C-alpha cells in the first residue's frame, strides 16, 4: 500500500493552496485511474474513474476517506498533479478550447474540457516528477540518495532542486524544480559507470507529471 496524503498535504499548502477556498486562486488536480495492469480481467486500457479539483486544505482533508474507499473498492490508483495551477488560467484555457471546438464544429465529449484545460494551463512555478524504479538486489534508499545528489549538482534557477520525495508502488518519486536535463543524463551515465550495479535506465523525468497519492492494490 502507498499512502502519501500527509506528504502532499504539506506540499500543496506550501504551493499556495489555502486552508479554505475563500479568496484563493490556486487549484490542484487529483485523478483516480484504473490501470490495465492492475486489473487483469478488465480491458488493458487505462481508465479515468474520477477527477477532483482541490482548492483548499479543507476540501483536501474531506476527500481523503472517499478517495481511499474508491481506490480499494474499484482497484484504482489516486494520482496528484505536482503542478498547482491558477483557476483563472484554467478558465482562460477552457474559453480557448470551447471557442475552437465551436468554430471547428467539434461537439464530441465536451465534458473533457476542464481536464484538458488544467493540463494546458501555464504554471508559474513548474515542477517535475523524477520516477525512480526499485532495482533487484539494490538498496532503494541508497539509490535514491545517489540520484538526489546528482540532481542537486545540476544547473537550475533554484538554490535547491529537490522539493520533496514520495514512495511509489514500484519505487520512489522525487518532486523537483526544472534543472539541466543534459547535465543530469551525463552525470547519471558517470554514476552508472562508477557503480556498475546501477544498470537500469536513467529515471524518467515527467515534466507535466502526476505523483502517486494512494493505492492499495
For each feature predicted by the language model, list its residue ranges.
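Signature for HUH/AEP ssDNA processing cores
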Residues: 1-168, 179-187, 208-217
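Short hydrophobic/aromatic beta-strand micro-patches
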Residues: 175-177
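Positively charged, low-complexity, intrinsically disordered RNA-binding extensions
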Residues: 196-207, 214
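A common structural junction motif
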Residues: 155, 188-200
Amino acid at each position: 500500500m502507498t499512502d502519501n496524503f500527509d506528504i502532499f498535504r504539506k506540499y500543496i499548502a506550501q504551493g499556495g493552496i489555502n486552508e479554505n477556498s475563500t479568496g484563493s486562486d490556486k487549484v490542484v488536480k487529483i485523478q483516480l485511474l484504473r490501470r490495465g495492469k492492475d486489473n487483469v480481467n478488465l480491458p488493458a486500457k487505462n481508465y479515468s474513474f474520477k477527477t477532483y479539483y482541490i482548492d483548499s486544505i479543507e476540501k483536501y482533508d474531506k476527500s481523503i476517506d472517499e478517495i481511499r474507499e474508491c481506490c480499494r473498492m474499484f482497484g484504482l490508483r489516486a494520482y496528484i498533479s505536482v503542478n498547482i495551477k491558477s483557476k483563472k488560467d484554467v478558465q482562460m484555457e477552457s474559453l480557448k478550447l470551447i471557442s475552437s471546438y465551436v468554430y471547428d464544429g467539434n461537439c464530441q465529449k465536451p465534458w473533457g474540457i476542464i481536464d484538458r484545460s488544467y493540463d494546458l494551463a501555464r504554471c508559474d512555478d513548474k515542477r517535475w516528477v523524477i520516477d525512480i524504479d526499485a532495482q533487484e538486489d539494490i538498496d532503494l534508499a541508497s539509490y535514491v540518495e545517489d540520484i538526489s545528489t546528482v540532481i542537486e549538482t545540476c544547473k537550475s534557477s533554484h538554490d535547491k532542486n529537490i522539493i520533496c520525495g514520495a514512495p511509489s508502488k514500484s519505487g520512489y518519486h522525487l518532486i523537483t524544480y526544472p534543472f539541466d536535463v543534459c547535465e543530469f543524463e551525463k552525470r547519471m551515465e558517470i554514476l552508472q559507470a562508477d557503480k556498475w550495479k546501477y544498470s537500469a535506465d536513467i529515471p524518467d523525468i515527467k515534466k507535466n507529471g502526476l505523483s502517486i497519492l494512494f493505492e492499495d492494490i
